[in-house]
Amino acid sequence: MTIKRHGVGPRLSQAVVHGDTVYLAGMVATDPSADAKGQTQQILKKIDETLAAVGSHKSKILAATVYVANMGIYADMNAAWDAWIDPANTPARATVEARLASPKYLVEIMATAAIQ
């Protein structure tokens, strides 16, 4: 099987396709001045765009890991997630409290999805 990388940078690729699976890099908000719900909405939009670029869709997400700067924002993050996710195709998901790359970031999401 071939490996195809998308959005390749010096440190990481935004997405890596292997067979019928796409692995997304951890994504953070474009505008980190937004609150947790706003940052999550920005990230989910980036996920939609990245999945579309490789021929997938949020309904095909197999697993997601959500990192939050503190569990106090869990409900706000979930409000954005619940409004976005396909309720008939919810993925396996974990939410982890973690120190992110910059204190401005409140949420980071990684996902793996099927392509077919």
Predicted regions and their residues:
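N-terminal presequence-like segments and the immediate start of the first folded domain
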Residues: 1-62, 68-116
